[in-house]
Swiss-Prot record:
Designated name of the protein: Virion membrane protein A16 homolog
GO molecular function, one term: lipid binding
Induction / repression: Expressed in the late phase of the viral replicative cycle.
Source superkingdom: Viruses
Subunit-level organization: Part of a stable entry-fusion complex (EFC) which is at least composed of proteins A16, A21, A28, G3, G9, H2, J5, and L5. Formation of the viral membrane is necessary for the assembly of the complex. Interacts with G9.
Length: 369
């Protein structure tokens, strides 16, 4: 509505040479506007373990060579350019970066879209203390993103493998293991071969199954071969003998009935993967049977148990209704016993009478007239 740009002026700031202002003047009595922008002037040498992002916006009118001119010769040997964040630049100030999202009225035609220059250091040695510091999360100062991205990429795998052999229980190592890369599995396979009882080995076994169970199985077999006297290993290293072989023929796989295998409180890391799978498919139900006498005659087995006792004696205590039902057979089992005893008493009584001697007596004749 009559507002037009009458003049554009660049204002430098001596205190911050790379920070400048664009003064936009309008006709019609409108107030001037100031736009802050940045222009690269410093030459960056780059410290080891850092990245360089000079205030230079790459647009269609600029080149990577212009952006790289702000790196020292030594830095150019170590750093490579990667995509940076989006930026806006003044067309008449190539490489400048505007410090605002909303473009003032009348200046739209002078603004170009681009991406900021960004360089990362690829000249890292895995023995360098800085890369170890970044990957092990000791400090994130000057750490490039490839070494501080929570192990999403494999750039830290080599250094973390050496670190986690020494400190496998540390939080960074466990976060690295959680990414489930094979180099981490190989590292923890070596550790858990000697320290399977450690809690981080439980995570290791869980992460390897089912796709990479070979790593955890190798660690379990190695550990249990060195600790045969450890009850936790008895499902894996059960002594081989004829008795066990016969039991397996009769009862099925030992993982379904051997206590060292069936104990639900046992950590899965003490079972091989196929044993762990087999245990979930077992159809056996354990129970206790009390036998008084066992008689074997050829192929006939005769079990003799004490059945006359109260059923309630072997009943697990539960709610009241269950106990009452369990005690009913105990009451009714007394009645037939009493009847039998009564019958025996009556029979004995009559037999006693029948067997008694006859009393001698004289015959008395009585006549009635």
């Amino acid at each position: 509505m009559g507002q037009h740009v009458s003049n554009i002026t660049v204002i430098a700031t001596p205190q911050a040479p790379e920070t400048k202002y664009l003064r936009v003047e309008y006709t019609g009595g409108y107030d001037d506007e100031y736009i802050r922008f940045f222009e690269a002037e410093n030459i960056h040498s780059g410290d080891i373990g850092s990245e360089i992002s000079p205030p230079f916006c790459l647009t269609r009118d600029t080149t990577v060579k212009q952006c790289a001119s702000f790196l020292s010769p030594e830095a150019k040997k170590k750093f490579v350019i990667v995509p940076g964040e989006p930026c806006k630049s003044l067309s008449f100030r190539p490489g400048s970066i505007l410090d605002l999202q909303k473009i003032p009225y009348g200046t739209e035609s002078y603004v170009l879209d681009g991406t900021r220059c960004r360089f990362i250091n690829i000249d890292y040695l895995y023995t360098d203390p800085d890369i170890k510091r970044c990957c092990n999360k000791e400090s994130d100062k000057d750490c490039p993103e490839i070494f501080s991205n929570n192990y999403e990429t494999d750039h830290c795998d080599t250094i973390m493998s050496s670190i986690c052999l020494q400190t496998p229980g540390s939080l960074p190592c466990r976060e690295w293991l959680e990414k489930k890369r094979e180099v981490a599995f190989d590292t923890y396979m070596k550790v858990c071969s000697d320290h399977l009882d450690a809690n981080y080995c439980s995570d290791f076994v869980d992460y390897t199954r089912p796709d990479n169970f070979g790593y955890s199985d190798a660690a379990i077999l190695s550990y249990c071969s060195k600790h045969r006297n450890n009850p936790n290993c008895w499902c894996v290293t059960t002594p081989k003998n004829d008795k066990l072989f016969s039991l397996e023929l009769a009862l099925g796989p030992k993982v379904c009935w051997l206590h060292e295998c069936t104990d639900k409180s046992k950590d899965r890391k003490y079972l091989l993967f196929d044993q762990d799978v087999q245990r979930t498919n077992c159809k056996y139900i354990g129970c206790n049977i009390n036998v008084d006498t066992l008689r074997l005659r050829n192929s006939v087995a005769e079990l003799i148990a004490k059945c006359g006792g109260s059923i309630a004696e072997d009943t697990v205590l539960g709610d009241d209704s269950y106990n009452k039902e369990a005690k009913l057979p105990s009451f009714f089992s007394i009645i037939p016993v009493c009847i039998v005893l009564l019958c025996l008493f009556v029979l004995f009584y009559f037999l006693r009478i029948y067997d008694a001697k006859v009393i001698n007596s004289n015959t008395i004749n009585v006549y009635r007239k």
